[in-house]
Amino acid sequence: MRFFRPCFIAGWLYRDAIFRIRTTEKLLCLTFDDGPDPDSTPQLLDILDTHSIKALFFCDGRAAEKYPDLINRIISKGHIIGNHGYSHLNGWITSLKSYVTDVSNAAPFTSSRLFRPPYGRLRFNQYRKLKGNYKVVFWDIMPYDFDRSFGSRNSLRVLKKKLRRGSIIVLHDTKNSTLQDFLTGFIDFSTGKGYSFILPEEIFCF
């Protein structure tokens, strides 16, 4: 079974975390996880630039260290880089000390105090430890673009069906992501419905 939105219990447990923009307007935020990737990120940046959209990138620390030129390009285009950990750890099976250390190791490659837990998996003691230094950001819609077996048509269908005011959308600028096949179509669909993609700094305080 696939879950396109976080479980409601997560919103109750992580009460100070962000899952959605609080707004009555037709505003959206695009976020991208697990990059940068030389085969995906440059094309993604071109698409965002064409549509004058600024986005939030939660970069894998190892990839950020490996591709500093891509990190610099993301920042130069006016996007924001959040912390996604250095080693993409699963919080459910990682000790508090190891998890916090991994987040700290990724900090030099970020440009904000925003953090998204890899896989969305975060134990409460980890959350409690991190929230003093970071604003934890989850998402409102995840269309499984990272899973090629799901397919780009299904990803686009999910986005169209689940889209609502204030949606924070998580996509992936990785080698296996299908986002290149549907992102432009999704942007055109959203703007055609009167939605605007807003700058991350207009949503988050950090």
Residue ranges, per PLM feature:
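Anion (oxyanion) recognition and catalysis
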Residues: 49, 75, 130-131, 191
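A short, conserved beta-to-alpha structural element at the edge of catalytic cores
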Residues: 50-76
